[in-house]
Curated annotation (Swiss-Prot):
Membrane topology: Single-pass membrane protein
Protein location: Membrane
Keyword annotations: 4Fe-4S, Iron, Iron-sulfur, Membrane, Metal-binding, S-adenosyl-L-methionine, Transferase, Transmembrane, Transmembrane helix, tRNA processing
Entries under CDD domains matching the protein: Radical_SAM
An example Gene Ontology biological process: tRNA methylthiolation
Reported function: Catalyzes the methylthiolation of N6-threonylcarbamoyladenosine (t(6)A), leading to the formation of 2-methylthio-N6-threonylcarbamoyladenosine (ms(2)t(6)A) at position 37 in tRNAs that read codons beginning with adenine.
Domain TRAM: start-end pairs: 438-500
Catalytic activity: N(6)-L-threonylcarbamoyladenosine(37) in tRNA + (sulfur carrier)-SH + AH2 + 2 S-adenosyl-L-methionine = 2-methylsulfanyl-N(6)-L-threonylcarbamoyladenosine(37) in tRNA + (sulfur carrier)-H + 5'-deoxyadenosine + L-methionine + A + S-adenosyl-L-homocysteine + 2 H(+)
The protein's name: Threonylcarbamoyladenosine tRNA methylthiotransferase
Recorded family membership: Belongs to the methylthiotransferase family. CDKAL1 subfamily.
Organism lineage: Eukaryota, Metazoa, Ecdysozoa, Arthropoda, Hexapoda
Sequence ranges assigned to domain Radical SAM core in this UniProt record: 207-438
Cofactor: [4Fe-4S] cluster
């Protein structure tokens, strides 16, 4: 198993449960994106100038006669933890075959893994494609955008890897470097009449963070939300067998991971297609979690968690499971939820939150809101405001509605943009009006330290409630459990001081850096030896043929 250093450009991918994303589209980027889609009349001189630029655009170098597996690849990812995991798998296969992962400037090929949830994400994805081609790079695209809309004009002529074909990334990259275009968008074959969830979980990985393993437990979902484009890409629910998920977790811990993230489009729906359930899987997983390591359950929609509330509450109280759940509500109005086809009402969501807060001490509930859905009235929005004011969620992801092509909601009459912005600002102001951690100063927690903060100034640990605690950067601190006292707090995190001496830190994972370098080197050596051997055999054969010809 290979691990990718955190400083590698293009590898800073934040998952949907993160509070602050370094990869979010900035206002300046959004402005640049808009410029690329503005329709305006062009003067003849402009057309001639653009034609000249097209002719001057550098062409990608064709690697027809170069040994495969010796080039450099840049990997960039947009979107959720599921996409992040897919990128780690693709990077792992490329590294295992000898390809070197690099920054964008020195790379021969760019592998771009896309997200189709929001318009700005697709806009930046499209701009990155254009940037790569403008700089003479080979480009391979992957993820939900090409899977959901493969006939998009800007994808013409590009190599495409479908969401269920990531185990074939090496052959796609090889052919692309030779100047060919390959498109693999088909679903995996069914096994015993059941749709397969995707590529095998046993594939090699290059992890974004060597301490964290992201496991996709299922692909697709059972819903038909009117605003969602991801359904077009990921399809209906397909779950991995529990024994495969458990084995992947066991292997990850053996390789030095100290935290597992379960991810999918809806973890609560897990197992319904294979006669299992999320609680059954969770109880099997806790049996293989080593002491001092942790498990985090990913996003689950209200309808399916309702059926298992008691069991889920029990699992979340387990000492090696974070007391955290991401349950997106999207709106506080039953009318809007009906138009969204969310298959639950506000009362259902409130029951989930109330039950978990009562049964699971210190539980953190994160949720999502869409502002400005086409049918949302002022009264509907007020219901959303009262819901958020009632629960004061510490993690609240606020999104403006984006009409995604091909979805039913895209055909509905839209609310004026200025009204959508006004509502978004009102909800954002409400969210920033309270400090969820203001009363924590002086509290003592045990935290698992697994990450580096976005500003690179702190290490990041999480307590049992998966609340973020910033710590001073000290040698050997990553991958340990330590006791901390909270000294200050902000909107999104707390700052702590370490109470333990270094000799008392509890290490939950062994150092994997040296073995990874050795394994990767051995992989390249085997590749070189293989081609050297082939060349030697061919050379000997040619010599024998010449000798026979001379004798005759």
């Amino acid at each position: 198993m290979y691990h990718l250093g955190q400083d590698l450009p293009g590898n800073d991918v934040d998952d949907i449960e993160d509070l602050i994303s370094a990869d979010d589209v900035k206002p300046r980027e959004r402005y640049e994106n808009k410029k690329t889609v503005t329709v305006r009349a062009k003067k003849r001189s402009q057309i001639r100038l653009e034609s000249q630029e097209e002719e001057e655009k550098p062409k990608p170098t064709i690697h027809e006669s170069v040994i495969p597996g010796t080039q450099k690849v840049f990997v960039k990812t947009w979107g959720c933890a599921h996409n992040n995991s897919d990128s780690e798998y693709m990077a792992g296969q490329l590294a295992a075959y000898g390809y070197r992962l690099s920054g964008k400037e020195e790379a021969d090929l760019w592998l771009l893994n896309s997200c189709t949830v929001k318009n700005p994400s697709e806009d930046t994805f499209r701009n990155e494609i254009e940037s790569g081609m403008r700089n003479g790079k080979h480009v391979v695209v992957a993820g939900c955008v090409p899977q959901g809309a493969p006939k998009s004009d800007y994808l013409n002529g590009l190599s495409v890897i479908g969401v269920q074909q990531i185990d074939r990334v090496v052959e796609v990259v090889e052919e692309t470097l030779k100047g060919h275009s390959v498109q693999l968008l088909q679903n995996k074959k069914k096994v015993h009449g059941r749709r397969v969830a995707g590529a095998p979980l046993s594939l090699p990985k290059v992890r974004k963070n060597p301490l964290i393993e992201i496991i996709s437990i299922n692909s697709g979902c059972l819903n038909q939300c009117t605003y969602c484009k991801t359904k077009h890409a990921r399809g209906d629910l397909a779950s991995y067998p529990p024994e495969e998920v458990v084995e992947r977790a066991r292997q990850s811990f053996a390789e030095g991971c100290c935290e597992i993230w379960l991810t999918s489009e809806d973890t609560g729906a897990y197992g319904r297609d294979i006669g299992s359930s999320l609680p059954e899987l969770l109880w099997q997983l806790v049996e293989v979690i080593p002491e001092h390591c942790m498990l985090r359950v990913g996003m689950t929609n209200p309808p399916y968690i309702l059926e298992h509330l008691e069991e889920v509450a029990n699992v979340l109280q387990h000492p090696r499971v974070y007391s955290f759940l991401h349950v997106p509500v999207q709106s506080g109005s039953d009318s809007v939820l009906g138009e969204m086809k969310r298959e639950y009402c506000r009362q259902d969501f409130e029951h989930v939150v109330d039950f978990l807060r009562e049964r699971v001490p210190g539980v953190t509930i994160a949720t999502d809101i869409i502002c400005g859905f086409p049918t949302e009235t002022e009264d509907d929005f007020e219901e959303t405001m009262t819901l958020c004011a009632k629960y004061r969620f510490p993690s609240l992801f606020i999104n403006q509605f984006f009409p995604r092509p091909g979805t039913p909601a895209a055909k509905m009459d839209r609310i004026p943009a200025n009204l959508v912005k006004k509502r978004t600002k009102r909800l954002t102001d409400l969210f920033y009006s309270y400090e969820p951690y203001a009363d924590r100063v002086g509290e003592i927690y045990t935290v698992l330290v697994t990450e580096v903060s976005h500003d690179k100034l702190h290490y990041v640990g999480h307590n049992k409630s998966y609340e973020q605690v910033l710590l001073p950067m000290r040698d050997n601190l990553l991958g340990t459990r330590v006791h901390v006292r909270i000294t200050s707090a902000s909107k999104f995190s707390m700052v702590g001081e370490i109470l333990d001496d270094e000799r008392d830190w509890t290490r939950c994972a062994k150092n994997q850096e040296l073995p990874n370098v050795q394994v990767q080197t051995r992989s390249r050596e085997r590749l070189i030896q293989r081609y050297f051997g082939i060349a030697l055999v061919l050379g000997s054969l040619a010599f024998l043929i010449q000798l026979v010809v001379r004798l005759l």
